[in-house]
From Swiss-Prot:
Protein name listed in UniProt: Envelope glycoprotein UL4
Assigned protein family: Belongs to the RL11 family.
PTM comment: N-glycosylated and possibly O-glycosylated.
Keywords: Early protein, Glycoprotein, Membrane, Signal, Virion
Organism: Human cytomegalovirus (strain Merlin) (HHV-5)
Length: 149
């Protein structure tokens, strides 16, 4: 079994390399994002960000961490001062509400658990956050640090 894994590893790496050469892509460069609980509703000062790299004109997708249908979800830019998009759950007969906000020099698609940045520029480098608020008004954050070259 181990031998089969080692034999197939170069093929997987070659596939990833060929995909990145012929299709715009970015590759996660370090650890996966971690969800941090915030006791004061603010982004924790000691939060650790997952590092991502991207190429100009490429795309990158960040995945939000766990959520439930009753959670309020937000994708944020910078230190959380700019909202990219928000999702509000179905509340007593209402439909789920989804808001997308215009951000200068940022082209994106947003879903409740993914943020895809499109046609990257170096101006898109920086920190992005996934914020989740549960029914008990407890806030959780995940951090993504993007470098575009």
């Amino acid at each position: 079994m181990m031998l089969r894994t080692w034999i197939s590893l170069p093929m997987v790496l070659l596939d990833a390399y060929c995909f990145c050469i012929f299709v715009s892509c970015s590759i996660s460069t370090t650890t996966a994002p971690v969800e941090w609980k915030s006791p004061d509703r603010q982004i924790p000062m000691n939060i650790t960000c997952a590092n991502y790299s991207g190429t100009v004109n490429g795309n990158v997708t960040f995945r939000g961490l766990q959520n439930k249908t009753e959670d309020f979800l937000h994708w944020l830019l910078g230190w959380g001062h700019k909202s990219i998009c928000s999702f509000f759950p179905k509340l007593q007969g209402n439909k789920e509400q989804h808001y997308m906000y215009g951000i200068t020099n940022l082209t994106y698609n947003c879903t409740y658990d993914r943020l895809t940045l499109l046609n990257l520029t170096t101006e898109n480098s920086g920190k992005y956050y996934f914020k989740r608020e549960d029914v008990n008004s407890t806030f959780y954050y995940s951090c993504y640090n993007l470098t575009v070259t």
